């Protein structure tokens, strides 16, 4: 085996372990592989072996690109238990080098290798997270390659899902929700495969961290605007949480484009799943996020934000965090959506007919933007809102009166819409002859609503506990015994109750 190994590798080093531990660059892939494998034999460092391996990888990252022909032999001999970070770095070197040379065969092989190791669960997810500047750009680039170059989005989706799942298990753990550049590509692949349910668990409405995808040595060189952008995003990405409830991790390093990709593509997935409230939350953040210049995602998000707002609220409000000048710019760039944004639902004004007319006149623009189905849904929803407004006015009503007051075309249309409202559990209905007896139902809270409420309660309990701890540890008037003894004079010692002693 040693002979075979030496034939595959060149420039072997007999002092690989010593070189690695001293921080020296290792001159060959064989030396690097030996240095990493020897980490597992050093029992005293078993707990931080992943960090040591990550340090070796960063010190020798250029070696993987220079020796890309030796990558497969390296993968065969490197132990994934200690060398997961090195193995993905090797695959990234092979992928990047092949892509730069337009070597499609080499690029395909790199994707095949990554798919194999991820699919077999060979990598240690905890070790992969230690090299975010390697694993996440690799997943992102592989996903885009499968999506755009090979027209195989299902492969890119499977690879990213498996890799992210190993690093951030979705098993109810209390691990922080982390945003990476790979998430947006994952959602883009799912929009092509139409496998929305599989990626739904990866769409977090409460993001705790942004992955630092800049190399640690390059952090000082990163653009301050990118870090400011990340801080603003984290400050807003807390759906259902009390204002300022969570501390934000400072100085995240991720290009704003990938954050916008996450927001926009994630919102598109949620729209397909009919989770309109959550989609609106992501779209509102995307529209309101600052950027160096107006990105395509900003304008596309504004268009969908207008339509989803009308579906949910019957009107379009200016986003709380939005830049009013940017909103005006969006309206100027999309006059059709400007007309939609001026709609205000009113039963007596026959709003659904006005919306239907706008949809017909803007059908070409809607089709180009991919919003035709949302617009059709909007027209139906406006008709349902008209019927819902009647339930608040009358507890019983004739079908013919519903048809007249809701400006609907036929009795069949009335009964069809009422049937849909019953199926959606928005009203209960009892029909007796031509009379309809109905009641509006309160919406059933979704799983996300319940989780958000629990998160708020947990946060309030934490604040209460911290407050009590501060009071007990404080001095003077901060102590509870003094606070309840204010009338006894500042010079008097606090009185302690003996009632229950």
Swiss-Prot record:
GO terms, biological process: cell cycle switching; establishment of mitotic spindle localization; mitotic cytokinesis; oogenesis; regulation of oogenesis; ubiquitin-dependent protein catabolic process
One Gene Ontology cellular component: COP9 signalosome
Superkingdom of the source species: Eukaryota
Localization, UniProt: Cytoplasm; Nucleus
This protein's record includes keyword Transmembrane helix: no
Principal localisation: cytoplasm
UniProt domain PCI: residue ranges: 275-445
Subunit structure: Component of the CSN complex, probably composed of csn-1, csn-2, csn-3, csn-4, csn-5, csn-6 and csn-7. Within the complex it probably interacts directly with csn-2 and csn-4. May interact with itself.
Job description of the protein: Component of the COP9 signalosome complex (CSN), a complex involved in various cellular and developmental processes. The CSN complex is an essential regulator of the ubiquitin (Ubl) conjugation pathway by mediating the deneddylation of the cullin subunits of the SCF-type E3 ligase complexes, leading to decrease the Ubl ligase activity of SCF. The CSN complex plays an essential role in embryogenesis and oogenesis and is required to regulate microtubule stability in the early embryo. Mediates mei-3/katanin targeting for degradation at the meiosis to mitosis transition via deneddylation of cul-3.
Protein family (similarity comment): Belongs to the CSN3 family.
Protein name (database record): COP9 signalosome complex subunit 3
Upper taxonomic lineage: Eukaryota, Metazoa, Ecdysozoa, Nematoda, Chromadorea
């Amino acid at each position: 085996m040693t002979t075979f190994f030496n034939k595959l590798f060149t420039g072997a080093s007999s002092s690989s372990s010593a070189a690695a531990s001293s921080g020296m660059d290792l001159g060959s892939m064989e030396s690097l592989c030996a240095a990493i494998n020897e980490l597992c034999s050093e029992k005293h460092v078993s707990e931080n072996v992943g960090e040591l391996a990550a340090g070796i990888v960063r010190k020798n990252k250029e070696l993987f690109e220079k020796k890309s022909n030796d990558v497969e032999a390296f993968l065969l001999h490197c132990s994934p238990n200690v060398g997961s970070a090195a193995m993905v770095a090797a695959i990234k070197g092979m992928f990047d080098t092949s892509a730069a040379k337009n070597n499609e065969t080499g690029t395909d092989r790199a994707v095949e290798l990554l798919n194999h190791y991820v699919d077999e669960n060979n990598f240690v997810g905890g070790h992969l997270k230690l090299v975010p500047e390697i694993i996440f750009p690799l997943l992102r680039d592989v996903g885009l390659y499968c999506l755009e170059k090979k027209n195989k989005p299902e492969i890119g989706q499977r690879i990213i899902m498996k890799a992210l799942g190993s690093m951030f298990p979705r098993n109810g753990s209390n691990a922080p929700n982390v945003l990476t550049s790979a998430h947006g590509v994952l959602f883009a692949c799912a929009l092509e495969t139409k496998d929305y349910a599989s990626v739904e668990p990866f769409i977090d409405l409460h993001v705790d961290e942004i992955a630092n995808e800049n190399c640690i040595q390059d952090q000082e060189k990163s653009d301050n605007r990118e870090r400011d952008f990340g801080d603003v995003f984290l400050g807003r990405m807390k759906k259902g949480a009390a204002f300022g409830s969570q501390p934000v991790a400072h100085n995240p390093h991720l290009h704003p484009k990938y954050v916008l990709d996450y927001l926009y593509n994630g919102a598109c997935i949620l729209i397909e799943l009919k989770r309109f409230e959550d989609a609106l939350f992501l779209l509102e953040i995307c529209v309101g996020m600052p950027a160096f210049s107006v990105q395509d995602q900003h304008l596309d998000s504004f268009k969908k934000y207008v339509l989803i707002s009308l579906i949910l609220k019957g009107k379009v409000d200016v986003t709380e965090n939005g830049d009013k000048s940017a909103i005006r710019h969006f309206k100027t760039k999309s006059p059709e959506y400007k007309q939609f944004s001026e709609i205000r639902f009113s039963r007596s004004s026959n709003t659904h007919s006005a919306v239907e007319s706008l949809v017909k006149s803007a059908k070409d623009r809607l089709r180009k933007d991919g919003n035709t189905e949302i617009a059709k849904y909007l027209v139906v929803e406006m008709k349902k809102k008209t019927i819902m407004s009647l339930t608040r006015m009358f507890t019983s009503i004739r079908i013919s009166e519903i048809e007249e007051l809701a400006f609907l075309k036929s009795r069949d249309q009335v009964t069809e819409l009422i049937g849909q409202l019953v199926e959606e559990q928005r009203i209960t209905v009892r029909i007796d002859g031509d009379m309809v007896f109905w009641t509006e139902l309160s919406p059933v809270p979704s799983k996300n609503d319940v989780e958000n409420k629990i998160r708020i309660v947990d946060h309030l309990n934490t604040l209460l506990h911290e407050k009590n701890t501060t009071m007990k540890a404080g001095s003077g008037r901060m102590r509870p015994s003094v606070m309840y003894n204010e009338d006894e004079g500042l010079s008097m010692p606090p009185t302690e109750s003996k009632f229950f002693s």
